[in-house]
């Protein structure tokens, strides 16, 4: 076989390989950054069937809109703790009015049976709840119920490209973390500095809040449920396990993702944001998580410089720790908050 024939064969094989690699990599990039998201109705039906929406419809909720760093509008809702009205018991500030035009005067008394009491000299407690990839804020209601029982006021919102927000590409935590910083600032502007503020996120919501810690936001605690430490490792695992495709395609997909969506997968490393972090973190993760293995939480716990706890839940797949072990989850959450807040 002459050298010309060999060269032609090699060129043909290379062309065939590229004909496979490039389209598949593009499909992967599009799948990651433009995912099919769950509708409110489907999420509502799912959460209701699981029993997580009991009493939710009767709660008084204020719809809010918070402009992010790039002008993108984030939609969400505020649910104050039982017995609290914005016209009393919350430190006033110049930025009290909501960015959605609200005058901040709406009273919202809950009805969840919370028996927590707040003395006149105690700080009001707030938590920002961030849902996971492809879902919407209704996925946070199960955690909202826990915090309301402990006397917290809750802010839950839709990630960009999800829920009630305008459609746009997802950046797996990069822009989403900056969105969360805008929500944190909004809470402080409306309710003042003399409050306790925490973050509780699930999956990509967890990754977003971990990335936000790099900017040292004004928060007092973080609860990370099934978050990832490195996006690349998650995608490699999924490509191999779910689609039985070679892991190297993640690298080529990342190149195309950078071209089309302006970020590479290698940039999304929440673990790096913890190298100087001092905010206490509670890591929650299912031992049987097939999407983001629990070792991601263990790696982040080893990396953070602040106080940390890791709680692993038996027989729990991705984002199912609370659903599988509600009592244990609630007890661990309460103990963590008592330890770091008193």
In which residue ranges do the predicted regions lie?
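Conserved alpha/beta-hydrolase
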Residues: 144-166
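Catalytic histidine-centered segment of alpha/beta-hydrolase-like enzymes
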Residues: 316-330
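Short beta-strand/loop motif that positions the catalytic acidic residue
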Residues: 276-278, 283-285, 289
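Alpha/beta-hydrolase active-site loop
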Residues: 170-191
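Hydrolase active-site cap/lid region
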Residues: 211-263
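The serine-hydrolase catalytic nucleophile loop
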Residues: 126, 132-146
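An N-terminal hydrophobic leader/cap segment in hydrolases
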Residues: 8-67, 77
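Alpha/beta-hydrolase fold nucleophile elbow
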Residues: 191-203
């Amino acid at each position: 076989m002459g050298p010309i024939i060999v060269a032609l064969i090699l060129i043909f094989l290379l062309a065939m390989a590229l004909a496979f690699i490039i389209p598949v990599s593009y499909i992967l990039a599009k799948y990651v950054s433009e995912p099919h998201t769950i509708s409110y109705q489907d999420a509502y039906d799912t959460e209701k069937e699981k029993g997580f929406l009991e009493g939710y419809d009767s709660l008084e909720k204020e719809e809010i809109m918070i402009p992010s760093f790039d002008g993108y509008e984030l939609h969400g809702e505020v649910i104050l703790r039982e017995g609290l009205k914005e016209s009393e018991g919350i430190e006033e500030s110049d930025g009290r009015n909501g960015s959605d035009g609200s005058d901040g005067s709406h009273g919202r008394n809950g009805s969840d049976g919370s028996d927590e009491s707040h003395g006149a000299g105690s700080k009001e407690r707030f938590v920002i709840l961030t849902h996971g990839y492809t879902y919407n804020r209704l996925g946070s209601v199960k955690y909202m119920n826990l915090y309301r029982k402990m006397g917290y006021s809750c802010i839950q919102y839709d990630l960009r490209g999800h829920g009630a927000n305008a459609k746009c590409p997802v950046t797996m935590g990069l822009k989403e973390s900056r969105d969360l910083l805008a929500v944190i600032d909004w809470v402080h502007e409306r309710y003042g500095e003399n409050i306790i503020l925490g973050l509780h996120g699930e999956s990509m919501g967890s990754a977003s809040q971990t990335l936000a810690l790099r900017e040292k936001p004004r928060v007092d605690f973080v609860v990370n449920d099934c978050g990832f430490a490195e996006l690349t490792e998650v995608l490699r695992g999924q490509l191999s396990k779910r689609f039985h495709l070679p892991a190297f395609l993640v690298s080529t997909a990342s190149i195309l993702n950078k071209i089309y969506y302006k970020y590479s997968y290698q940039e999304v490393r929440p673990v790096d944001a913890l190298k100087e972090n001092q905010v206490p973190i509670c890591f929650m993760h299912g031992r049987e998580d097939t999407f983001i293995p629990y070792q991601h939480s263990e790696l982040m716990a080893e990396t953070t410089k602040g106080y940390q706890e890791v709680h692993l839940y038996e027989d729990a797949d991705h984002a199912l720790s609370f659903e599988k072990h509600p009592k244990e989850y609630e007890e661990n959450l309460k103990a963590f908050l008592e330890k770091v807040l008193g």
